[in-house]
Design a protein with these regions (language model features):
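Single conserved hydrophobic/aromatic residue that forms the stacking wall/gate
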Residues: 1-11
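Generic long, charged, amphipathic alpha-helical segments
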Residues: 101, 118, 139-143, 179, ...
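Non-catalytic terminal/interface segments that mediate subunit docking, oligomerization
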Residues: 51-148, 261, 267-279
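Terminal amphipathic helices with adjacent charged low-complexity linkers/tails
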Residues: 12-56, 246-275
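Short, ordered loop/turn segments at secondary-structure junctions
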Residues: 12, 95, 125-126, 162-163, ...
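Phosphate/diphosphate-binding loops
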Residues: 8, 14, 132-180, 188
Length: 279
């Protein structure tokens, strides 16, 4: 006999499944239904990039979304909903990402691509992390799977760098080799290295030579210089790493405009028996 809690969980899961099915087309050969329900040019309020729930709610039509795999690897969160009436999937990456988080994102992207649903990546991550030396191999495999999932996906792929985009996560989720369009908020930092690591590699001589400051102060000084001159959003735009620097309040409107533009996208992969998924 099922307990009351088990019955409630079954009802909740059934309702969530029904909501997910309502967002999916009948097959990959059909477009998902477009439902007009919200102002497409609506501005979003000032939101901390780290507040994923508030940001996703502000972007979605009516503030409504469905989170999938919520109990697993919270450094990557994945949602489904509508934006400008279009069915979309959202991958929100924040903090340091584990191998499990990368695999969670890869699985979700492949699920969205099965039905040709656009994927929007929200990036505010300072790189990847491992719990132990033994997990290093798992991390490499997970990174390969994430890159594979984004590279193979033919559905529209948009990215917004809301904070930091450091290392491999940016390359897979928001890099111009994979994303159709990448936007950045003005304060974004986009780099292969963290500012602290960049100082250790690129500014070691300057830190030693700066006798007017302590070592910690000199490191902080050159970390700020690295962000300003190399890793900031303006320099990323100049180098073609992002397509545009946008007003955060207009993020929803810019994404919907991009979805409308990419609505007729019909991409295909080269003919072959199957892709060689990194196992």
């Amino acid at each position: 006999v099922r307990s009351r809690r088990q019955r409630q969980m079954c009802i909740r899961d059934s309702l969530k499944a029904k909501q997910v099915l309502a967002l999916l087309p009948s097959s990959n050969l059909e477009d998902s239904e477009i439902i007009d329900s919200d102002d497409m040019s609506r501005l979003i309020p000032a939101i901390d990039a780290a507040d994923v729930d508030a940001l996703v709610a502000a972007l979605m039509d009516g503030g409504a979304s469905i989170e999938l795999y919520a109990a697993y690897e919270p450094s990557v969160r994945v949602f489904m909903g509508r934006m400008g009436g279009h069915s979309v999937g959202v991958v929100a990456a924040s903090g340091k990402l584990t191998a499990g988080a990368l695999q969670k994102a890869a699985r979700f992207v492949r699920f969205m691509d099965c039905f040709g649903i656009a994927v929007i990546s929200l990036l505010n991550t300072c790189g990847v992390t491992v719990d132990s030396v033994n997990a290093q191999g798992w991390l490499f495999k997970a990174q390969s799977q994430l890159l594979f999932a984004y590279a193979e996906a033919t559905a529209p792929k948009l990215a917004v760098v809301t904070g930091d985009a450091i290392g491999q996560a940016y390359v897979a989720m928001g890099g111009k080799a994979n994303a159709d369009i990448t936007y950045a908020w003005p304060g974004a930092v986009i780099s292969a290295l963290t500012p602290e690591a960049a100082v250790a590699v690129l500014y070691a001589d300057q830190v030693k030579a700066d006798k007017d400051l302590s070592v910690e102060e000199a490191r902080a000084k050159y970390a700020g210089e690295y962000v300003e001159k190399v890793a900031g959003a303006v320099n990323a735009a100049k180098d073609g790493m992002v397509d545009d620097i946008i007003d955060p309040a207009k993020t929803r409107a810019m994404l919907i405009s991009a979805l409308e533009m990419l609505g007729s996208k019909r991409d295909s992969n080269p003919p072959k028996k199957h892709d060689n998924l990194p196992m």
